[in-house]
Amino acid sequence: MAAVLEAGSAGQFEQLIQNSAKSLTVVHFWAPWAPQCTQMNEVMAELAKEQPQVMFVKLEAEAVPEVSEKYEVTSVPTFLFFKNSQKIDRLDGAHAPELTKRVQRHASSTSFPATPNSAPKEDLNGRLKKLINAAPCMLFMKGSPQEPRCGFSRQIVALLNDQKVQFSSFDILSDEEVRQGLKTFSNWPTYPQFYVKGELVGGLDIVKEMVASGELDQMCPKAQSLEERLKALVNKAPVMLFMKGNKEMAKCGFSRQILEIMNNTGVTYETFDILEDEEVRQGLKAYSNWPTYPQLYVKGELVGGLDIIKELKESGELVSVLKGDQ
């Protein structure tokens, strides 16, 4: 089931959903005119190789309008997740790391997520506190920084980017409970909302004023360039392994093999899951001029991939290389 299937009609779509039995089915509602959809098709093709037990389906949203309307798909890309012919999750927008996360989560689960009545909900105020403190600067907006879904959100993202502010965001269109609850929690009725260190700064107009006065510049951390970020990551620990998955669970055969070798050396090392961050995944290939994963670094310098690690192990040099003796 490694290939991405295509549903060209409502009947074909229904048949694919019904035939998938208890396995996970991920449907990408896409459009050929949207470049972000083409990019996400490539991500799906990669995921199909990594998750052969999952069925991946492409459906051109405008070509099969009855299915798009049934599931209230109004923009592309949109991803729907099905099990036992029932929709269990939805993801709007081109968010490769989040798509990867959700596929992994649902693929590893053999049952449906708990229904709202079967388990107590996390206290909403507690959840909102966690969200507004999720990063030093948090923007609650419609859409994502890559794909804002209203003019005000687009303007505030442009302002923050112009000021090189490092911020994280939350798409309030993806969670109605957060969307309504945050209005009351912060006594602020509109979006976007910008928070610094868990405190509400305000909306677009206030952020504009703070940019003009220079206050925002003093208040918010500056975003690193990708090169600066990659340099910091490869130097995060003396020995850094960039892989698919983590120490507890490798998500490809090559990563699994290199973990076994590393664990047998007794040398302390840290890992970074490249499936969690598409920017790092692609950027590190160019940064180190090394096109594949896993990649192993010692003191910020690339050692190589699995084949080189195997060679170093066979020659008896691996431990001394990992300890920085060579």
UniProtKB/Swiss-Prot annotation:
Keywords: Cytoplasm, Iron, Iron-sulfur, Metal-binding, Repeat. Disulfide bonds: none annotated. Pfam families: Glutaredoxin, Thioredoxin. Residues 1-108 form the Thioredoxin domain. One of its GO terms (biological process) is [2Fe-2S] cluster assembly. GO terms for cellular component: cytosol. InterPro entries: Glutaredoxin, GRX_PICOT-like, Monothiol_GRX-rel, Thioredoxin-like_sf, Thioredoxin_domain. The keyword Coiled coil does not apply. The keyword Iron-sulfur applies. Residues 125-227, 227-326 form the Glutaredoxin domain. PROSITE patterns: GLUTAREDOXIN_2, THIOREDOXIN_2. This is Glutaredoxin-3. It comes from Xenopus tropicalis. The gene is glrx3.
